[in-house]
């Protein structure tokens, strides 16, 4: 008996449903991690931060690199439609995420936390998971010469280094209450160069984390 056109179609409802559930789980896991990162980098519990702002602060915390929001802004230009304005804003948010994940991938490569082949194919969620483990202190191994380095609150860190700052409560913090001394791997910034590869994850955009 010949199969019906419906049964021979390339995509069944069950496969689409499974893919949708997988994507939803990935979004939920990503948002959960971003909420954890937000607790680390926010200046107060009431501070509102977008996902992109959280990522930018994590990049600065790990590598000392300040990604500037202004560099991603679109020019006002002539009067545009509401649809065009929303499209431009979404593109700006996407560009910010690409830039932030690129720097996080560089950090992973510079600190030998994964192979270059794995990093090239790595999904953004996996990038966040690795960074979260680093912050929790489970993946910090000094395989290269280290130097004690004082970190002053509110002062930028030279981007050649990858500082891992813990305060007196053993919490990772942008603004430690005391000036700690940390072990900083001496890693040349030119050791690796990771291309900016945007991995489309059909991620539903949520402006405010938490």
Curated annotation (Swiss-Prot):
Residues 18-33 have a biased composition (Basic and acidic residues). One of its GO terms (biological process) is Notch signaling pathway. Residues 1-33 are annotated as: Disordered. Residues 14-65 form the bHLH domain. It comes from the Eukaryota. One of its GO terms (cellular component) is nucleus. Expressed in intestinal cells (at protein level). Keywords: Developmental protein, DNA-binding, Notch signaling pathway, Nucleus, Repressor, Transcription, Transcription regulation. The keyword Amino-acid biosynthesis does not apply. Residues 1-15 have a biased composition (Low complexity). GO terms for molecular function: protein dimerization activity; RNA polymerase II cis-regulatory region sequence-specific DNA binding. The keyword Transcription regulation applies. It is found in: Nucleus. InterPro entries: bHLH_dom, HLH_DNA-bd_sf. Gene3D superfamilies: Helix-loop-helix DNA-binding domain. Its main location: nucleus. Disruption phenotype: RNAi-mediated knockdown in the intestine decreases the E.faecium-mediated protection against S.enterica infection. RNAi-mediated knockdown reduces the expression of genes including bar-1 following E.faecium infection. RNAi-mediated knockdown in the germline or the nervous system does not affect E.faecium-mediated protection against S.enterica infection. Homodimer; binds to DNA as a homodimer. As a homodimer binds DNA via the E-box sequence 5'-CACGTG-3'. Represses lag-2 transcription during embryogenesis via Notch signaling, in an unc-37-dependent manner. Also represses tbx-37 independent of Notch signaling. In the intestine, plays a role in probiotic-mediated protection against infections by pathogens such as S.enterica. This is most likely by positively regulating the expression of genes such as bar-1 upon exposure to probiotic bacteria such as the E.faecium. This is Helix-loop-helix protein 26. The gene is hlh-26.
């Amino acid at each position: 008996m010949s199969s019906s056109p419906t049964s021979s179609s390339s995509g069944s409802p069950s496969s689409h449903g499974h893919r949708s559930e997988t994507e939803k789980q990935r979004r939920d896991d990503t948002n959960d991690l971003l909420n954890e990162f937000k607790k680390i980098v926010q200046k107060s519990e009431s501070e509102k931060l977008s996902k992109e702002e959280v990522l930018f602060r994590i990049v600065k915390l790990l590598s000392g690199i300040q990604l500037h929001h202004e560099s991603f802004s679109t020019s006002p230009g002539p009067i545009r439609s509401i649809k065009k304005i929303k499209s431009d804003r979404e593109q700006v948010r996407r560009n910010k995420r690409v830039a932030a994940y690129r720097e996080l991938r560089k950090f992973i490569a510079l600190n030998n936390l994964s192979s270059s082949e794995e990093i090239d194919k790595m999904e953004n969620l996996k990038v966040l998971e690795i960074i979260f483990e680093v912050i929790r202190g489970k993946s910090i191994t000094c395989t290269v010469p280290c130097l004690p380095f004082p970190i002053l609150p509110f002062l930028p860190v030279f981007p050649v280094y990858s500082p891992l700052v813990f305060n007196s409560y053993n919490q990772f913090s942008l603004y430690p209450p005391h000036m700690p001394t940390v072990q900083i791997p001496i890693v040349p910034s030119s050791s690796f160069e990771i291309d900016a590869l945007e991995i489309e994850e059909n991620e539903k955009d949520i402006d405010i984390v938490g």
